[in-house]
């Protein structure tokens, strides 16, 4: 069985809804076991509240949070993030930055990956 991880970060729910679609499509492939997870949030609740993100995040609060150590158990990845000033979110970046030791150890060699993003407004709003 091929294990696929659809991993996302979202504040407003847009990247979450995209992740649901990616996961649904991947589940249509015979022989694939697909898991949908979110990255651990690194931004404080105070900042999330000021940004208006606490309420929208309730939509996907039930989605399990991924850990770095589980990544080598998957055969493929789809990473989803909103854009922040043209870049991935700092939360997704923080998660991925913690995977360097897997590269050094060769633990993710041969894995397949893709990315998707949501974006919607200018000026970082």
Residue ranges and their predicted role:
Residues 1-107:
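N-terminal beta1-alpha1-beta2 submodule of the flavodoxin-like/Rossmannoid cofactor-binding fold
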Residues 109-125:
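Short, glycine-/small-residue-rich phosphate/pyrophosphate-handling segment
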């Amino acid at each position: 069985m091929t294990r696929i991880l659809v991993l996302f970060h979202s504040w407003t729910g847009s990247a979450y809804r995209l992740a649901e679609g990616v996961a649904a499509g991947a589940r249509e492939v015979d022989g694939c076991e697909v898991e949908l997870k979110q990255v651990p949030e690194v931004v404080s609740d105070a900042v999330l509240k000021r940004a208006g993100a606490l309420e929208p995040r309730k939509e996907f609060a039930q989605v399990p949070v991924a850990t770095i150590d589980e990544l080598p158990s998957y055969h493929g990845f789809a990473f989803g993030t909103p854009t922040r000033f043209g870049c991935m979110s700092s939360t997704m970046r923080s998660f991925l930055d913690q995977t360097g030791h897997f590269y050094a150890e060769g633990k993710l060699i041969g894995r397949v990956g893709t990315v998707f993003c949501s974006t919607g407004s200018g000026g970082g709003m």
